[in-house]
UniProtKB/Swiss-Prot annotation:
The keyword Transferase applies. GO terms for cellular component: cytosol. This is 1,4-alpha-glucan branching enzyme GlgB. It comes from Methylococcus capsulatus (strain ATCC 33009 / NCIMB 11132 / Bath). Monomer. The lineage of its organism: Bacteria, Pseudomonadati, Pseudomonadota, Gammaproteobacteria, Methylococcales.
């Protein structure tokens, strides 16, 4: 260690090197021209002796410091020379001096990043294999404008922040260093010294592609992937996929608790791919939505407290293992949507919080920068580099992993400055309102760029308020999302279904109110993970009554969901009526499928999926009023509703009975004077029902409900039926029930 008197004798540059606080170590270290000779200088705190070349000149120690220097002949010394140094144990080490290499990042890269519009920023910042003058190594770069000094530390330098200080690139706030001969697989972090206070922070790489398995937090140098994709046909078709008018049935799942291995551990992405895809295909879903697999430190956060925005979590394997997962889904006709969290981030010391000793990614004022309910921090969307970080993350997952969509979490918390805040605990925008103008601009940029760069990819908002035009184009004043979750419908229908059927006629409006706004947005109907946790009970547990009634209620609820306007989303376990709440620490309760009732619900969901996807009237106009018309929305006394779903050329009739009372001789008006037949009945025996229903139904010229013709039906209790005009049509595998 250099004493204070010696330090005082050094030049300011030398002092800053010795104290590990120099912003431009290249000004001191490396190769410098002196007259007709070159001066080589290095800083090696553990060295006893240093040579240039294995048999070259011994470098002189400067004033008792760990700075070594010597003069060499320029013509006889390699441009990128190798230094050999001996430590206190007598062991010799060697390395090519990193301070002989010029800056690698282009001014244009830095300009675009400063403007917040570098769509490939993940290829610039972070740690990347790189070659300079035929020498392979790793180029490190990070953004920390308020740092006095940043060093790359890792197992390659004993985690010593004095060994590899980086250079700052002007006013950009970006720091970089090329370290020769490093290999992928090594652990690293950034050691950051704050300019104002001199505090030192050890941080994971915000752009890291892979991380240690928690609880460890180091980033891992990764090589550029050589994964050979096999989904070219899928991607080509996706570009022209008319998703507005196509069926979308999403299976939401948590990769860590869908299934476990024999020892109770996590499945690898590759093993999960095979088991999950086979199951999802058999159940008839079109897409899988993964709860966040971005790297995160806390299992109990379910992935929603992200620290690695460019890395699949190491819990389930490597980045290439995740590529295999997506590839296998695509080769089997299954799309993949990722739950992505740009609304907030955790306070973990190794993460983004106060990254350079200041509120860099977040706001300094907690009234803007903190979610106190969640214990997390809020991004500063008005800062170009922060916006670019998030946009780069979204584009990274779509480009590198071929994902088919992003579900954007907690959008409402981004839109409102007063979200979950008391009066006086938030700061109005410049117009005095509660709208977060910077977040709105970010979301519009996100949707615009994603749709431009990746046609056919979906961006879906979890947005729980009445914010207008969430799914309308940005050029008309909308936010530009493809779809949004219909939280209002979900809430109303679950409240209704929780009522004892004897009381439901008092709450009939909760069945029908949703149609007043059903076509104001492009809605997804979600029964998500949020509805089966925190004491809310499982979907089955929400249903009233004894065992028969609970299962029948759930079957009619799912029938309504799959025939109601909007795309579909169902959380794992709900498809077979799991009895308990979801628990992220264990697998789903798969033994329940040994029960005929639970197996029947899975059969019902599978048949509803196939009916939905094979019946264009049920999906072609999910987002337009021409695809829906009421037959009768007013039969509150009997808790029955009926409606028509249409496309341009066909229609189906849906009748739902929400009481445990069979309705015989129940007449409804129908659109056309043709025969009808049941193509679906949730009371079918194979679903666990009593097999009460209708065979071919004759239309009568009896005016009813304002229609010229009508039919007389038998409505099974707590059940829904779907009728189609007599023609070849989809029929459940177990057959259509008949009158008894």
């Amino acid at each position: 260690m250099t004493d204070s008197s010696t330090l005082a004798e050094l030049s300011p540059d030398f002092q800053r090197i010795v104290e590990a606080r120099h912003h431009d170590p290249f000004a001191v270290l490396g190769r410098h021209r002196r007259d007709n000779r070159d001066l080589i200088r290095a800083f090696l705190p553990q060295a006893e002796e240093v040579r240039v070349g294995s048999a070259g000149r011994v470098m002189e120690r400067i004033a008792g410091t760990a700075i070594f220097e010597c003069e060499v002949e320029a013509e006889t010394t390699d441009l990128h020379y190798r230094l050999y140094w001996t430590d206190q144990t007598g062991q010799t080490h060697s390395f090519i001096d990193p301070y002989t290499f010029p800056p690698r990042l282009s001014d244009f890269d830095l300009y675009l990043f400063g403007e917040g519009r570098h769509w490939n920023i993940y290829r610039v910042l972070g740690a990347h294999p790189h070659s300079v003058d035929g020498i392979d190594g790793i180029l490190f770069a990070t953004w920390a404008p308020n740092a006095e000094r940043i060093s790359v530390v890792g197992e390659f330098n004993g985690w010593d922040g004095r060994r590899h200080p980086m250079r700052v690139r002007g006013a950009s706030g970006v720091w970089e260093l090329f370290i020769p001969e490093l290999q992928p697989g090594l652990l690293y972090k950034f050691e950051i010294r704050n300019r104002a206070h001199g505090t030192i922070h050890l941080k994971s790489d915000p752009y890291g592609r892979q991380f240690e398995l928690r609880p460890n937090t180091a980033s891992i140098i990764t090589r550029e992937s050589g994964y050979a994709w096999n989904d070219a046909d899928w991607l080509a078709q996706r570009k022209d996929w008319p998703w507005l008018h196509r069926p979308l049935s999403v299976y939401e799942m948590h990769a860590g608790s869908w299934k476990r291995d024999l020892e109770g551990g996590y499945l690898n992405y590759r093993d999960l791919a095979h088991e999950l895809v086979d199951y999802v295909k058999s159940a008839g879903f079109s897409h899988i939505e993964l709860m966040p697999v971005t790297e995160h430190p806390l299992d109990a956060s379910w992935g929603y407290q992200t620290t690695g925005y460019f890395a699949p979590t190491s819990r389930f394997g490597t980045p290439d293992d995740f590529r295999y997962f997506v590839d296998h889904c695509h080769r089997n006709g299954i799309g993949v949507i990722l739950d992505w969290v740009p609304a907030h981030f955790p306070k973990d010391a190794h993460g983004l919080a106060r990254f350079d000793g200041t509120a860099l990614y977040e706001h300094e004022d907690p009234r803007l920068g903190e979610h106190r309910d969640w214990g997390t921090l809020i991004y500063n969307y008005g800062r170009n580099e922060v916006k670019n970080f998030l946009l780069g993350s979204a584009l990274f997952w779509l480009e590198e992993f071929h994902l088919d969509g992003l579900r954007v979490d907690a959008v409402a918390s981004m839109l409102y400055l007063d979200y979950s805040r008391q009066p006086g605990d938030w700061i109005p925008n410049k117009y005095g309102g509660n709208e977060n103008l910077e977040a709105i601009a970010f979301l519009r940029d996100l949707n615009t760029v994603v749709h431009q760069q990746f046609p056919g990819v979906l961006v879906i908002a979890e947005e729980s308020t009445a914010w207008p035009q969430v799914t309308r184009p940005t050029w008309t004043g909308g936010l530009g999302f493809s779809m949004k979750w219909n939280m209002g419908w979900m809430h109303d229908i679950l409240v209704y279904m929780g009522k004892d059927p004897v009381h439901r006629h008092y709450h009939h409006d909760q069945l029908t109110f949703g149609l007043l706004y059903a076509f104001t947005e492009n809605f997804v109907l979600p029964f998500s993970h949020d509805e089966v946790v925190h004491g809310k009970g499982s979907m089955l547990a929400k249903m009233p009554g004894d065992e028969w009634r609970r299962f029948a209620n759930l079957r009619v609820l799912y029938t309504m969901m799959f025939t109601y306007p909007g795309k579909k989303l169902l959380f794992m376990g709900c498809e077979f009526a799991q009895t308990g709440e979801w628990n992220h620490t264990t697998a789903l309760d798969w033994p329940l499928l040994e029960s005929n009732l639970h197996k029947g619900v899975l059969h019902l969901v599978s048949d509803l999926n196939r009916l939905y996807q094979s019946t264009s009237a049920l999906y072609a106009y999910d987002f337009e009023s021409q695809g829906f018309e009421w037959i009768d929305s007013h039969d509150a006394a009997q808790s029955v509703i009926s409606y028509v779903r249409r496309d341009d050329d066909s229609h189906v009739v849906v009748v739902l009975n929400f009481t445990p009372v069979p309705r015989h001789n129940y007449r409804i008006g129908v659109p056309e004077p043709v025969g009808y037949r049941e193509v679906f009945n949730s009371d079918a025996e194979c679903y666990g029902g009593a097999n009460l229903g209708n065979w071919e139904i004759k239309t009568e010229s009896v005016e009813w409900m304002g229609r010229a013709q009508s039919v007389v039906l038998t409505l099974p209790p707590l059940a829904g039926i779907v009728l189609a005009p007599v023609a070849p049509s989809a029929t459940p595998d177990c057959g259509t029930p008949g009158d008894e």
